[in-house]
A protein has these predicted regions:
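Extracellular/periplasmic carbohydrate-active domains that bind, remodel
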Residues: 18-255
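Bacterial N-terminal signal peptides
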Residues: 5-17
Length: 255
């Protein structure tokens, strides 16, 4: 019979190591999502996202299929994982995007909430390889701003990686008042801005392929007296190894 001291067991444990537990997973289909591109899956998505946040965080899984949704909101420690051949498509109905105060061209004003939105949360993001499609039909005289596809506001540790975004009636992505933002290996296609970094700090944009009709990447920090009053600069931004095509305005702009 062999005996092991506590010190020996601890040493062996340190050498072998223990695998970290996988993140909790919440499949949108388990919450009623259909994924046929016709029936709206907004409620199912929001239930999955809320359950993930309440459980302390994890991943919300979007399996293959085409999911028609209105605006949904991500919570704390929640990653939306778009699996292979998964497509999220924004609804064409403006009523599926609640009205709220939004940041637009450097000022706060009433507007429609983004397709995928987050506010005042930590450790949130979206990872691929799926696709998110905005809906240009939402942009109309009664909604001149259109609907941004991805818009976290006042969030910390935001991660977007490895998926495709096609624009709808507005900018593709608009992180606002966020800290520690990582945007990596995104493909963005559309006729408006690709990435608008608005009064954010510690932002890394790398290995992205952006082809837009307007600015590919734009750095913003407010406008006029309102921008001076709020006093939130965009700072410490690293952009590297990106392919940028701006067909009408700038590939990289600061305004």
């Amino acid at each position: 019979m062999k005996f092991f001291t506590l010190a020996t067991i601890v040493a062996l444990s340190a050498q072998i190591g223990f695998a970290a537990a996988p993140p909790a997973a919440f499949n949108v289909r388990d919450f009623g999502a259909v994924g046929d591109g016709t029936n709206k899956d907004t409620v199912a998505f929001q239930k999955a996202l809320d359950s993930c946040a309440v459980a302390g965080g994890g991943e919300v899984l979007v399996p293959a299929g085409k999911y028609l949704i209105g605006s949904v909101q991500l919570g704390n420690r929640t990653i939306l994982r778009l699996e292979t051949n998964s497509v999220i498509t924004g609804s064409a109905d403006a009523n599926d995007y609640p009205m709220m105060d939004i940041r637009w061209e450097g000022r706060w004003q009433p507007g429609r909430r983004a397709l995928i939105y987050a506010a005042n949360v930590d450790h949130t993001g979206i990872v691929g390889p799926g696709r998110i499609e905005g809906n240009p039909a939402v942009a109309a005289p009664q909604n001149p701003r259109g609907v941004v596809v991805l818009e976290p506001i006042s969030c910390n540790d935001v991660r977007w990686e490895g998926f495709t975004v096609t624009q709808g009636g507005n900018w593709a992505t608009h992180p606002t008042y966020c800290t520690d933002v990582t945007i990596k290996n995104l493909k963005i296609i559309g006729n408006r801005d690709g990435i608008d970094v608005d009064s954010c700090k510690n932002v890394r944009i790398e290995k992205c392929d952006i082809n837009t009709g307007d600015d590919s990447i734009s750095l913003k920090s407010g406008r006029g007296l309102d921008g001076a009053r709020i006093g939130k600069p965009t700072e410490n931004v690293l952009i590297e190894n990106c392919n940028l095509v701006g067909r009408r305005f700038a590939c990289l702009a600061a305004c």
